[in-house]
Design a protein with these regions (language model features):
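Selective transmembrane alpha-helices of multi-pass membrane proteins
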Residues: 70-72
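Interhelical loop and helix-boundary elements at the membrane-water interface
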Residues: 2-16, 23-67, 76-141
Length: 141
């Protein structure tokens, strides 16, 4: 099996997002950084790291609408890992959760996240598709 740039990029995205989420959880838990800030870091990472990583690997994942739709679905469904019984059984998930669990959102933190992810991807996917139809590249620069 050949490790294409798309596969390498997908693995790098998973590792990068996991690292960011563990780091923001540690900032909130051990260094008392306000969750409002760590949550923003997580949101930025979730929506912008994939674009940056694709550019580093010269991957074409952002031109493939099906790949994008599946990635958005998997990312949104991955929030299931943050349900309380799972978090209690797997401590790293609890640490990651603490990076975006604002006190004012409790006990509805996951509901808020589901809606934010769904709304974000509902806007992003059609825009990316439209830009692709127009021949415009998605770029950070």
């Amino acid at each position: 099996m050949d490790l294409t740039p798309e596969i390498q990029s997908t693995v790098a995205k998973g590792l990068a997002l996991t690292t960011v989420m563990l780091s923001t959880g540690a900032l909130a838990r051990y260094f008392n950084v306000k969750v409002n800030y760590t949550r923003k870091i997580n949101h930025f990472a979730i929506f912008f790291l994939p674009v940056f990583i694709d550019q580093q690997f010269n991957a074409e994942t952002f031109t493939d609408f099906i790949y994008l739709a599946i990635s958005a679905l998997i990312t949104t469904l991955s929030l299931v890992s943050f349900y309380e019984p799972i978090r209690q059984a797997i401590p790293p998930f609890q640490l990651m959760f603490e990076g975006f669990d604002r006190p004012e959102d409790r006990p509805h933190t996951l509901s808020w996240l589901w809606t934010q992810f769904a709304a974000g991807f509902a806007v992003m996917l059609p825009i990316i598709w439209l830009f692709g139809q127009w021949g415009l590249e998605l770029s950070l620069i």
